[in-house]
From Swiss-Prot:
Keywords: Disulfide bond, Knottin, Plant defense. It comes from Viola odorata (Sweet violet). Probably participates in a plant defense mechanism. Disulfide bonds join C4-C18, C8-C20, C13-C25. It holds the Pfam family Cyclotide. There is a cross-link at G1-N29 (Cyclopeptide (Gly-Asn)). This is a cyclic peptide. One of its GO terms (biological process) is defense response. Belongs to the cyclotide family. Moebius subfamily. The presence of a 'disulfide through disulfide knot' structurally defines this protein as a knottin. The keyword Disulfide bond applies. The lineage of its organism: Eukaryota, Viridiplantae, Streptophyta, Embryophyta, Tracheophyta. This is Cycloviolacin-O16.
């Protein structure tokens, strides 16, 4: 999959397989 690490100040991650661990997207196990 794609690496996570985008910021998610809106609470949303646009990278598939990532979830928001404010303020950075983290990979969903």
């Amino acid at each position: 999959g794609l690496p996570c690490g985008e910021t998610c100040f809106t609470g949303k991650c646009y990278t598939p397989g990532c979830s928001c661990s404010y303020p950075i997207c983290k990979k969903i196990n």
